Structures are given as C-alpha cells and as structure tokens.
Design a protein with these regions (language model features):
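Short, well-formed alpha-helical segments that are part of the catalytic scaffolds
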Residues: 1-8
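Hydrophobic residues within beta-strands of alpha/beta enzymes
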Residues: 10-11, 62, 91
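Ser/Thr-glycine-rich phosphate-binding loops at phosphate-binding pockets of nucleotides
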Residues: 2, 15-21
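A structural signal for isolated positions on well-ordered beta-strands in alpha/beta enzyme cores
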Residues: 9-11, 33, 166
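Short beta-strand/loop segment that forms part of the nucleotide-sugar
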Residues: 8-16, 37
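Receiver (REC) domain switch/active-site residues of two-component response regulators
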Residues: 8, 30, 68
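Active-site-proximal specificity loops/subdomain of glycosyltransferases
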Residues: 20-65, 73
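Catalytic-site signature of metal-activated, phosphate-bearing donor transferases
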Residues: 44-52, 72-242
Length: 242
C-alpha cells in the first residue's frame, strides 16, 4: 500500500464500506490496525471526534486521510526532517483534486500499479493569502488535531507546507462505475444532524448530479505533468525518456 512506505503505523477506521478497503488493508498492510467505527451514521462532527479520540493514543506526526487521499512526497526522510526543521507543530499539505480529462482516453486502473502513477490530471487548490486556506490536509504532532468539521482547518497554529508534497485526492478520478458507486453510497448514511447543519450535504447526490459535477470540474482540470512541483514527485511520468 502507498502509505505503508511513508508511515510507521496506520489505523483504518472501517465505516462499513463496500469498496473492499478492509480486505485490501489486510492483504497489503497486515500490520496495520482495523477498527470498526462506533459512529453508526455519517455525522461529520461525531466522525471527526472519533478520529481525534484515536489521535490521543498516538505520539509523533499524525495525519488523517480518507481512503481516496494519498500523501505524496519525493523523499520520506527529507519530508519529515523538514517538518522538524521548519519548527511548526502543524502543517497544511496542499491538495490536488484529481479529475479525469474525458478526452485523454484513460482506461480502468490496473491493481499492480500505484493509482498515483496511473492518473495525472487534476487541479491544485492554491493558497490565496490572506484568506484562510481550507484546501489542505493537516499533519501535526499535537495531542489531537482540534479539527473543524471536515478536518481541513484547526484552531491550532499551522503553516502551509510550500514545498513539493501534495495530497492527491481522487475526486472525480478514476471516473468509472466503481467510483460513482462509492460516491453514491455515502449520502444515505448521513445523519439528520449533519443534514440539518449543512455538513457533508455534497454527498447527497444522484447519479445525474454526479455526472454534471464531473463535467463542471473537467473545465478546470489540467495535465499535472506540466507542473514543476509535480515533476519533482513523479519524474518518471513527466519525463519518460529520461
């Protein structure tokens, strides 16, 4: 698994997913923990509280990612050393929203090749100072992240990590039946509390709405191989003849 090479330990919180996450974890990361969620409905506040309670058990650098999110850096040791050198306890790692270019001719992924090597179209969420940056995922060594709902923001002081490292969020990619079904399975599990407070309501979508969303996001997707920072992370994709 992608993250076994980056982190010493991993905990998969199983929320009854039907995307084979548990089976895949047992196969490729048998030393990782699998914990069944105690939150029966998808409630953004309660889910994040559960995550933070687990974080309290862990020391060192911690990062909470969804199964569709992949932390990517060029060199693991240089990355974690830089977190210490920069002197902060929390960093926002910039996110790239992966969105298939419908004209590119992508085929279904092959399981023997890392997904991050099979897709290279997306949109980088750029920080826009002085506006707060809500587009990243947080890595920290606090007792817990004190996250706001959604885990993109925290009252803890943090800085945006402006070096070649990204979270690749497979947003509308791979845009195939499996991904569509995955998106559709979340909405029915939303709690009334979340819906009432407008938390996670983007998951309340029909297939037609998803297709329209996808078309909308394709207008801003780009070939990441032309991005200089992405080239540092994936030189084999960007310069295949070198």
């Amino acid at each position: 698994m992608h993250h076994t090479k980056l982190f010493d330990h991993g905990i998969l919180i199983n929320r009854g997913s039907t995307d084979r996450s548990v089976e895949i974890c047992k196969l490729f990361a048998p030393h990782w923990e699998i914990r069944d969620s105690k939150v029966l409905e998808f409630d953004a506040v309660l889910v994040d509280q559960e995550v933070m309670n687990i974080e309290k058990e862990i020391t060192g650098w911690k990062m909470v990612l969804n199964t569709t999110e992949f932390l990517c850096c060029a060199d693991k040791h240089a990355f974690f050393s830089s977190l210490a050198t920069l002197g902060q306890n929390m960093y926002a790692i910039r996110t790239i929203l992966m969105v298939d270019d419908p004209t590119h001719g992508y085929t279904n992924p092959r399981y023997g090749i890392p997904l991050v090597k099979q897709r290279y179209h997306g949109r980088l969420i750029h920080p826009n100072p002085p506006a707060p940056y809500y587009g990243g995922r947080l890595i920290h060594n606090f007792f817990h992240g004190s996250y706001w709902a959604g885990r993109h923001w925290s009252p803890h002081p943090f800085m945006i990590y402006m070096y070649p490292a990204f979270v690749l969020k497979f947003f509308y990619s791979p845009w195939n039946t499996a991904m569509k079904n995955r998106k559709l399975q979340i909405g029915p599990t939303l709690s009334k509390h979340s819906i009432r407070h407008g938390l996670g309501i983007h998951h309340l979508a029909t297939l037609d709405k998803l297709e329209k969303n996808y078309i909308h996001f394709t207008t801003s997707t780009t070939d990441l191989r032309l991005n200089s920072e992405y080239q540092v992370l994936f030189p084999d994709l960007c310069f295949p003849n070198h």
